[in-house]
């Protein structure tokens, strides 16, 4: 399989927006009242031309002091230096922590040779300093030392890779579609973060425009079913990569089933 879910674990998030590790087998949700419980997994996709990272996780380190994202990329059979393209759905903290890494007391890009594709409006929003959802110091490092491509609206990155400005979760959220080896991969970021959100219709209060996100999920779900997309779910609890079918409603199954 060319797509790899780089799981970073399960977390609880309260009103402080701090991500605290949560072990469903040992921790009691009642001890964390008022919290959301989510999983985090960036994705790595090998195409004919690129090694693509889709969003970058929390930036946590493992027990050896290594960036967890780097460790997970190696476990998938690649080296972090091989990543050529970093596609960012948006720039909230839980999607950007792994974009930078500290070595010998200095912080630099975690993927110095990769092109980072970011919506210009989202980039500018991150520098405003008006929301705790963004960590400005990360973007200062990227601005100084990384290859950043700022895009606007919707378009083509290169052959087979497209981006679409959606809004919904935040004003400048974008999604990506990648055609490779006869398959189409769809990364919906936080507009379509879990397969369950296709099955259960709701407008989330944590979205910038919850109703629009709900409508987008319906739209993308229908396209995914009609065109046999392989969907990547960044906050999925169980099924991180799935294909969508639609009869009376949506269902999602593993690509191999």
Regions found by a protein language model. Give the residues of each.
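Histidine-centered catalytic micro-motifs
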Residues: 86-96, 166-173, 233-238
